[in-house]
Amino acid sequence: MVINLWYNKQMKEWRWSLTETGIMTQHTGGQEELRDAMNDVANTVEYILDNALKEE
């Protein structure tokens, strides 16, 4: 799992991408507030992990 986080000045928002390299899936998002962007990333990781556990 690879997570990238950056600030886009033109859009005035924190952007993020999360790539699951093993299955070549990507999730992306953006928020004006850093804390909200980080929460989105955390929620996405938890969602991925919850679904991975259900598949086992």
Give the ranges of each region predicted by the language model:
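A short, exposed loop/beta-hairpin motif centered on an aromatic-Gly-Thr core
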Residues: G22-N39, T44
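Non-catalytic effector/regulatory segments
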Residues: M1, S17-T19, A52
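Short, mixed-charge low-complexity intrinsically disordered segments
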Residues: Y47-E56
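Intrinsic disorder/low-complexity detector
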Residues: W6, Q10, G29, A42, ...
